[in-house]
Amino acid sequence: DNSDVPENTHLVSKEVQAAFNAKYPQAKDVEWELKGDYAVADFYWDGGEHSAWFNPLSAAWYMTETDVRYENLPEPVLAAHKAGKYADWRVDDVDKLTREGMETLYVIEVEKGESELDLFYSSTGILVKTVVDTGHEEDYDDYLPQPDANGIIAIVKQKYPNATIVEIEREKGLQEVTILDENR
């Protein structure tokens, strides 16, 4: 059994490997790949399947995607989904997105007939975003924390001290920030 020997380590620096090993010391079946500007480790840890995203140069961790069983979702997320308008849709997959300095998101992929949706919930059960699922493999790279070149995070924290950032996206040359403040 070679599950303790990571695959494709030649793709990432020793610093990235060390940062990964410090964060997930018990990881098994680790396999590295480069996706865009990120070094991504797919692995098993703590009874589940995960993908962790790192900066290949600085070795900074950005995000971990974790496969989650529907019944293991936090109670507020389960309750919100069961009471929501997509409760009668079939649940296809559930992922947890843990991100550096940002709100943890739970993505419930649902389908009904030919329609497929990704439902993004905060850990408090707020449905923050609904996205049509295109059927392509989802990496959630749009939800990776972005460099804060314009000091946006500091501005948000100054104006909304109790807010958590859900998403920062660039649209038509402008940056749009989605926050949760007092569970709204």
Model-derived segments and spans:
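Bacterial Sec-dependent N-terminal signal peptides
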Residues: 1-8
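N-terminal trafficking/processing presequences and adjacent post-cleavage segments
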Residues: 2, 50-51, 65-67, 71, ...
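Short, non-transmembrane alpha-helical segments in secretory-pathway proteins
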Residues: 8-26, 70-92, 141-165
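A cross-family detector of function-defining hotspots
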Residues: 28-46, 90-109, 165-182
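Amphipathic N-proximal alpha-helical interface segments
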Residues: 38-66, 105-135, 177-184
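Short, charged helix-to-loop "capping" segments that act as catalytic/coupling loops
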Residues: 55-58, 84-87, 100
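A charged, solvent-exposed segment within the mature domains of Sec-exported extracytoplasmic proteins
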Residues: 92-146, 150, 162-164, 171
